[in-house]
Amino acid sequence: MKEFLAYIIKNLVDRPEEVRIKEVQGTHTIIYELSVAKPDIGKIIGKEGRTIKAIRTLLVSVASRNNVRVSLEIMEEK
């Protein structure tokens, strides 16, 4: 699932080499922490959050087939 997420994100951004995805696994939950270049954050979120919502919907759909819960968080660099 991490590779699937990476494929989607890298095709949306201008700097795919700066995409970082950290996977944190719990008992029945997987949390993906996404870091992208600062100028690409807007592309990931999309207008009114539509793009990130669509990505999360796809992840939840794939995860439900495997009986796990999934969460996607965008990490902001300081």
UniProtKB/Swiss-Prot annotation:
NCBIfam families attached here?
PRK01064.1 (NF002201)
According to the UniProt entry, its GO molecular function terms are:
RNA binding
- Which Pfam families does the annotation name? KH_KhpA-B (PF13083)
Keywords per UniProt: Cytoplasm, RNA-binding
Q: Which HAMAP family match?
A: KhpA
Q: Which gene encodes it?
A: khpA
In the UniProt record, which is one GO cellular component term? cytoplasm
Q: Which organism is it from?
A: Chlamydia pneumoniae
The entry's family comment says: Belongs to the KhpA RNA-binding protein family.
Q: What does this protein do?
A: A probable RNA-binding protein.
Q: Domain named KH: which ranges?
A: 29-78
Q: Tell me where it resides.
A: Cytoplasm
User: This protein is called what?
Assistant: RNA-binding protein KhpA
